[in-house]
């Protein structure tokens, strides 16, 4: 705020003039000095009033002449030369006063225009301040509250969605755990089935070895039977040869007993023994073969059942493996979705936090702007108050000057009469002019400092 200074100085009166009779007189002179300086928050005014004391002094706003001498006697004649000189001086002073009044009026009009302009600016600032207080803050507050509610709603939805996903994840984890336990049981059963199958295979191998051994024994028995048959046939041939030789010998020598029946009996006995041995061997072979076949059938049935169980277990394992893979894929998908949702929620929360920070910064900026407008408004109020004080001071000075200017015509005749009285009654008077300086400092419309100083400016000797 620029500092405005104004000063107003008025000087009235002139040097005392000697009349033709050689008497001396002192006219009263007055001097007013007003200065003001305005600063934001502090205003000071200084008013200097000095007057030269004489036998006739001014008192109060209406200027009246009062004499300290005894009442003057009316002279027989009036000195019109002195009155003419005083009238000329008064006219010159009136001309100067008129020019100064015109200048003062122009400055006063400029001050009034400036005050009006400042009042308009003040009204504009007050309107802007009211608008910012009424609409701007509430609108921003409503937007802020609405966005906060939306953020809270989305955050609640995200929390609920996260809880639901966690419940699904826990359920899937439980299902996966159950499937893993079931898979473990199936693997244990599979290992047991493989162990049983291995034992069955060992039994089958043993049965196969026993069957091969029995087959080898049957072959050896068959070979032995063939050998016995050959041996029996050979013995029969030998016996027949012996019998033929014995028949010949009997025929040649003597008649011997009949051996055909004996040979027949022996042959019959050997054939019976061979048939019995062959039947026993065949029965033993058949019984062993039947036992081995039954054992092989039993082992084959167990093997077939084991293979079927193994195939079933393999299919179940494949099914469970597929389900586990699907569960793993679903779990990974859910975990990926959950991570994406957490990242999205974190990003949205960061964006909302940035929005909240930006709104808070805007609110803080608007508060600072409101504070700045309030300070400017206070400064304008201080300037307006200082201008009002200065205008009031000018008004008082103008009223005082107008009331003082209305009396010079009447005072001239009085002064002329007093001069003639002084000629007839010389007086020795000592006059002293006193200078009063009063300084007042104000801030925010309150007086903070006030001081007064008295100075002896001039001493006058009146005879």
From Swiss-Prot:
Coiled coil: none annotated. GO terms for molecular function: structural constituent of cytoskeleton. The record marks 345 as: Stutter. Residues 1-89 are annotated as: Head. Residues 240-262 are annotated as: Linker 12. Pfam families: Filament, Filament_head. Belongs to the intermediate filament family. One of the most prominent phosphoproteins in various cells of mesenchymal origin. Phosphorylation is enhanced during cell division, at which time vimentin filaments are significantly reorganized. Keywords: Coiled coil, Intermediate filament. This is Vimentin-4. Residues 1-47 are annotated as: Disordered. Homomer. The keyword Coiled coil applies. GO terms for biological process: intermediate filament organization. It comes from Xenopus laevis. Residues 148-239 are annotated as: Coil 1B. Residues 17-37 have a biased composition (Low complexity). The lineage of its organism: Eukaryota, Metazoa, Chordata, Craniata, Vertebrata. One of its GO terms (cellular component) is cytoplasm. Vimentins are class-III intermediate filaments found in various non-epithelial cells, especially mesenchymal cells. Vimentin is attached to the nucleus, endoplasmic reticulum, and mitochondria, either laterally or terminally. Residues 90-125 are annotated as: Coil 1A.
